[in-house]
Structures are given as structure tokens and as C-alpha cells.
């Protein structure tokens, strides 16, 4: 029977869930879902100075917002310190590790000597074969692994291929500090083994760690998980991703109005592809994703592409689903809470009606909010500078006449108001734009909006006529 796939996402809670971590989580999640397996979550909180509960909460919130649900309870690495110590001591008992009593000064002297001789600054194995009886009194030792002295360690990587590390470069690294706490290198191996992790999918900046971790696995006689080291995300110029180029936490993307489904789609395409498909649903990504198809080369982050993709997702999304996400996101958008506070039941209905037109003109929820502002604007409207230019004396006089004609309409719909405005333009010898543009300025305070007849229908007779008359003057 085939062993079920178990992946894991293991962030350090020292800040928000950044975009690179989000993609790593996504790849782990997609592969687990694709294979019918599980994705576990481990919080690597052993750095007590930098790890905070707030950062842990932010990471969990970011994953939940993206829809990357984990299986089981999150595991705290710090809480497993006694288990890490137990395995380190077992390695000593097996003869695969040893106590080292070197002082920091002695270690530094070794490194200086190695540098002077043109060798890498490595620990020289002083205590590797020493009799523990020679241990100095009053000195708390560290535990070091007995790394192989010759040959090479080969990592069979699903993305990078076979990667070879000369064992002479790996040295006898520390697995347990003198205070009894584990090093990252050791804790990761013990946790992955105990959690039953079958596939380790992480950034290729961890590739050198894989060689050292393989030594611990072999020393314990444990199976080494399948390794897949995915390329890092670079900026548009090919350099390290900076905040200016997108190296932000996912909460920043929520505040910029990106849909979680669109962000996941974009992140999946950074380093992985499925033919020429650019726009994918979550279900399609789960069906198509395979870790073997991830590219070795670094992917370049492009804000414009992501924004365009977000716009496509918004336009393709069911209106009711988009309405729900928009309402839920409003508290995270600049000006969104104030908009939300004004959304009574009537205006919620108006927003639902306006959504088809609004989403055609928006690439983000922030732009959608901006476009929807006219719905909650208080009379008399604040008119922006461009719109004010359209409302000269002739235009205002025209609006007064138009308001009187439209007041007599029986039905007030997009179709009936369009017919009335077109008739008015024709009867007064004006082009439609010469009527519609000042009308838009009066109704929304701006020069851009959804279709003007949709705006009239959404606002309704009373509000529309009130706004037109506010900007009109009698002849």
C-alpha cells in the first residue's frame, strides 16, 4: 500500500507571513491536496527572543485568509525540546554523536588557524574520539554529530536533481547546545520524523541544510523524506525581492485589495506552470499541480501581472461571492470601515445591483471601493476637479431641464432612463456624451463610474433627481 503524502509548512513566528513563505505553504498545500495527503503546520518558535504570539497569530490569519487550511493542530517546536534532547543523547549512546567541551575561545582559535592555512573555518573534531573521562569539570558540553569524514552526501532533490556535498565541508556540527536546547538543524529532523513527514518542500536557501539533516537521519536509521527545494522569488530586475517589488506580508496584499484566490493563482505560477494556462481556479491548481513540474530557476515577481490577474479573477467571480469577499475585506482596506459603516440594508442592495458594472472597471477591491464611493456619498456631493470642469453654466442649466423631464418617468430603470436621456439629447440637438458626462458628474462627483444608466437605476428616482438638482441651475 502506498504511503500517504504528508507535507508540512514550518514558519518561524518572527513577523507576518511574507510572500515567499506564502508560496511555500501553497506548494505544500497543493501537493498534499493533489495526492490526497495531508499538510501539517509546525511553528518553529525556538528563538524565544524573536518569536511572539502576535506573529504566530498573524501567520495563522494569513494562511486562513489564503484558504490554506492545515490538518490537525499546529505543533510548537519549542514545546518539543525534551524530545530533541532525548534524540541527541540517543545519538551519543549509539556512538553517532559526542560531547564537546571546547570553550568559545578554543573554537575561535581553531577557525583562525584554519583561515591562516587557507581552509574553511571548521571545527576540527578535537573531542570526536577523546575519552569522556578527560572532560574538564564545571564545563557544560554541547553535543556534536559525527559527520562522515570522507566521500559525499547526495541529496536526491525533486526540483534541483542530485546535489552533491563533499563530507569534508560539513564538519561535526552542534545538535544540542550547552544549555540543553536543540539547534534548528537537529530539531527540524526530529520533528519531521515524528510528524511522519514524507515530503519536505521548502525554499532552495535550505539546500545546504538538507545535507546536514541527511546525516542526522542516517545516524538515527530513519528514512529521509523526499526533498524538493523550490527556487526563491526574485524582483523584476532579477535581484533579491525588496519590499518595493513585493516582499511584503500577505496582510499587505489583503489591504491592497487582492483576492486570495488570485494571489494563490499568481504565486503558483511563480516557478510552476501548466501549459499556457495563466488563469486557474483553486480546483484546477489542485488537479494539475505536481512538484516535479516546478522550475529550478528563480521566478520574477511582477506587480502589474498580478494586478491584471486579480482583475480577471474579479470579473470571472460570481457576483454574490465577490460581494461577500468585498464586505469581509472592507475593514482591511483604507477607507473601507467608513464605507461599511454607511452600508445600511438599502445601500447593500444598491451595491449588489451596481457590482456587475463596478467590477468591470476595477482590478482590485481597493479600486472597487473607490468606484462604489458614489453609493454612500452624502448630498450635496463633493465634486472633484475634473468633474467640476464639466459642470459649467450651460451644463447646469441643461441638468435643470433634464431633471424636470425625467421626473415624469413612469418606471425608473436603466432602460427607461436611457431612453429618456437619449430622447432629451436628440430633442435638444446635443450629442449623447454632452448630456451623459455632466449627468455623471452630478450623480457621482466624478468623471468615471459604471454605466451612467446603471448608476441612475441603482440610486433610484429620488436620490438621482436630488443629486441632479443639487448641481442644476434654473435658466
UniProtKB/Swiss-Prot annotation:
One of its GO terms (biological process) is glutamyl-tRNA aminoacylation. One of its GO terms (molecular function) is ATP binding. It is found in: Cytoplasm. Residues 116-137 are annotated as: Disordered. Monomer. Its main location: cytoplasm. A motif ('KMSKS' region) lies at residues 240-244. NCBIfam families: gltX_bact. It comes from the Bacteria. Catalyzes the attachment of glutamate to tRNA(Glu) in a two-step reaction: glutamate is first activated by ATP to form Glu-AMP and then transferred to the acceptor end of tRNA(Glu). This is Glutamate--tRNA ligase 2. Residues 116-133 have a biased composition (Basic and acidic residues). InterPro entries: aa-tRNA-synth_I_cd-bd (IPR045462), aa-tRNA-synth_I_codon-bd_sub2 (IPR020751), aa-tRNA-synth_I_CS (IPR001412), aa_tRNA-synth_I_cd-bd_sf (IPR008925), Glu-tRNA-ligase_bac/mito (IPR004527), Glu/Gln-tRNA-synth (IPR000924), Glu/Gln-tRNA-synth_Ib_cat-dom (IPR020058), GluQ/Sye (IPR049940). ATP binds at residue 243. The gene is gltX2. A motif ('HIGH' region) lies at residues 11-21. Gene3D superfamilies: 1.10.10.350, HUPs. Disulfide bonds: none annotated. It is an enzyme of class 6 (ligase). It catalyses: tRNA(Glu) + L-glutamate + ATP = L-glutamyl-tRNA(Glu) + AMP + diphosphate. GO terms for cellular component: cytosol. Belongs to the class-I aminoacyl-tRNA synthetase family. Glutamate--tRNA ligase type 1 subfamily. Keywords: Aminoacyl-tRNA synthetase, ATP-binding, Cytoplasm, Ligase, Nucleotide-binding, Protein biosynthesis. Its EC number is 6.1.1.17.
Amino acid at each position: 500500500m502506498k504511503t500517504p503524502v504528508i507535507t508540512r509548512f514550518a514558519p518561524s513566528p518572527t513577523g507576518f507571513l511574507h510572500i515567499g513563505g506564502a508560496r511555500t505553504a501553497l506548494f505544500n498545500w497543493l501537493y498534499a491536496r493533489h495526492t490526497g495527503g495531508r499538510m501539517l503546520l509546525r511553528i518553529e518558535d525556538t528563538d524565544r527572543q524573536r518569536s511572539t504570539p502576535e506573529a504566530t497569530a498573524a501567520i495563522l490569519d494569513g494562511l486562513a485568509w489564503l484558504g490554506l487550511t492545515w490538518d490537525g493542530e499546529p505543533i510548537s517546536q519549542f514545546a518539543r525540546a525534551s524530545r530533541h534532547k532525548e534524540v541527541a543523547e540517543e545519538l551519543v549512546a549509539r556512538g553517532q554523536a559526542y560531547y564537546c567541551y571546547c570553550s568559545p575561545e578554543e573554537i575561535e582559535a581553531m577557525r583562525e588557524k584554519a583561515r591562516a592555512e587557507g581552509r574553511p573555518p571548521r571545527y576540527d573534531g578535537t573531542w570526536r574520539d577523546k575519552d569522556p573521562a578527560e572532560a574538564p569539570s564545571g564545563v557544560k558540553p554541547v553535543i556534536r554529530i559525527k559527520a562522515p569524514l570522507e566521500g559525499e552526501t547526495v541529496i536526491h532533490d525533486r526540483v534541483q536533481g542530485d546535489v552533491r556535498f563533499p563530507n569534508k565541508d560539513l564538519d561535526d556540527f552542534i545538535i544540542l547546545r550547552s544549555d540543553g536546547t536543540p539547534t534548528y538543524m537537529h530539531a527540524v529532523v526530529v520533528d519531521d520524523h515524528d510528524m511522519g513527514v514524507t515530503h519536505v518542500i521548502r525554499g532552495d536557501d535550505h539546500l545546504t541544510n538538507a545535507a546536514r539533516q541527511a546525516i542526522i537521519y542516517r545516524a538515527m536509521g530513519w528514512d529521509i523524506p523526499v526533498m524538493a527545494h523550490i527556487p526563491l522569488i526574485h524582483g523584476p530586475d532579477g535581484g533579491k525581492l525588496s519590499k518595493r517589488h513585493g516582499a511584503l506580508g500577505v496582510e499587505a496584499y489583503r489591504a491592497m485589495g487582492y483576492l486570495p484566490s488570485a494571489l494563490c493563482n499568481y504565486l503558483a505560477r511563480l516557478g510552476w506552470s501548466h501549459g499556457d494556462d495563466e488563469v486557474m481556479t483553486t480546483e484546477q491548481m489542485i488537479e494539475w499541480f505536481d512538484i516535479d513540474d516546478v522550475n529550478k530557476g528563480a521566478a520574477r515577481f511582477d506587480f502589474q501581472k498580478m494586478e491584471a490577474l486579480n482583475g480577471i479573477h474579479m470579473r470571472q467571480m460570481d457576483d454574490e461571492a465577490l460581494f461577500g469577499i468585498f464586505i469581509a475585506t472592507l475593514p482591511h482596506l483604507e477607507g473601507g470601515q467608513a464605507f461599511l459603516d454607511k452600508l445600511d440594508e438599502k445601500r447593500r442592495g444598491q451595491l449588489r445591483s451596481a457590482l456587475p458594472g463596478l467590477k468591470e472597471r476595477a482590478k482590485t477591491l481597493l479600486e472597487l471601493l473607490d468606484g462604489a464611493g458614489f453609493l454612500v456619498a452624502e448630498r450635496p456631493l463633493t465634486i472633484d476637479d475634473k468633474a467640476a470642469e464639466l459642470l459649467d453654466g450651460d451644463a447646469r442649466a441643461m441638468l435643470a431641464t433634464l431633471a424636470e423631464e425625467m421626473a415624469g418617468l413612469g418606471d425608473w430603470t436603466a432602460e427607461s432612463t436611457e431612453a429618456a436621456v437619449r430622447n432629451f439629447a436628440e430633442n435638444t440637438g446635443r450629442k449623447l456624451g454632452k448630456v451623459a458626462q455632466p449627468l455623471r458628474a452630478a450623480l457621482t462627483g466624478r468623471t468615471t463610474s459604471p454605466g451612467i444608466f446603471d448608476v441612475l437605476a441603482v440610486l433610484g428616482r429620488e436620490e438621482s433627481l436630488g443629486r441632479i438638482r443639487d448641481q442644476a441651475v434654473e435658466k
